[in-house]
């Protein structure tokens, strides 16, 4: 009751492959991001080596750190949208891309080729909190559980429905996103499920608000030129 925010992240973390220490605790807060992550990143070394070429150093003994740097690099430095971030780190399979409309195929192939070293493999579910909002994402095979619910102007994201019911016993529209399908919540704009937008939900600032932002919609210059 003493704190106010439009978005909250929390995690009861049990580290299995890394030391349990305060530097790797969750929510992992760094570079204006707050990340909670359930899973194991098998592509960690590939992702880490790529990020080190751009000055990011992974020193905190948690694979969540490299996720944070990837988000910062793509969102802040490359000016991708969170939707595009999701299409990089949980990129659709090539066979899935082949079934998309031509323009979308071109964009997804471009992102996969240019940022191939930032594909995150292994089982994971992630909630990324940043200024103005939240993005939740599963690995593309959905090897970790993640559910979403809503009540009035609030959105709840958790590994299990039971956790949502603790916060909001009468939560509605409980939904399990597909693997690789981003769930993005924009403050005062609404909720975005993959390619489905629910404009009835406008997240308001209040003492127990949950929700978020999904960026400014900008494309990096090279992507704008290729995809006007």
Regions found by a protein language model. Name each.
Residues 1-209, 215, 220-228:
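Conserved short alpha-helical segments that host acidic/polar catalytic motifs at enzyme active sites
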């Amino acid at each position: 009751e003493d704190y106010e925010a439009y978005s909250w992240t929390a995690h009861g973390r049990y580290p299995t492959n890394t030391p349990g220490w305060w530097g790797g605790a969750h929510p992992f807060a760094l570079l204006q991001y707050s990340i909670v992550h359930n899973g194991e990143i098998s592509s960690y070394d590939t992702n880490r080596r790529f990020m080190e070429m751009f000055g990011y150093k992974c020193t905190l003994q948690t694979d969540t750190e490299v996720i944070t740097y990837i988000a910062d690099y793509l969102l802040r430095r490359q000016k991708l949208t969170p939707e595009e971030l999701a299409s990089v780190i949980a990129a659709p399979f090539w066979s899935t891309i082949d079934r998309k409309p031509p323009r979308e195929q071109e964009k997804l192939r471009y992102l996969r080729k240019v940022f191939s070293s930032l594909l995150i493999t292994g089982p994971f579910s992630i909630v990324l909190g940043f200024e103005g909002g939240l993005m939740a994402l599963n690995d593309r095979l959905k090897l970790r559980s993640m559910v979403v619910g809503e009540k009035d102007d609030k959105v709840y994201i958790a590994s299990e429905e039971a956790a949502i019911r603790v916060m909001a016993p009468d939560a509605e529209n409980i939904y399990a996103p597909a693997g690789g399908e981003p769930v993005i919540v924009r403050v005062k704009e609404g909720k975005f499920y993959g390619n489905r937008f629910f404009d009835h939900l406008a997240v308001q600032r209040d003492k127990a608000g949950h929700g978020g932002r999904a960026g400014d919609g900008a494309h990096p210059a090279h992507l704008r030129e290729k995809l006007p």
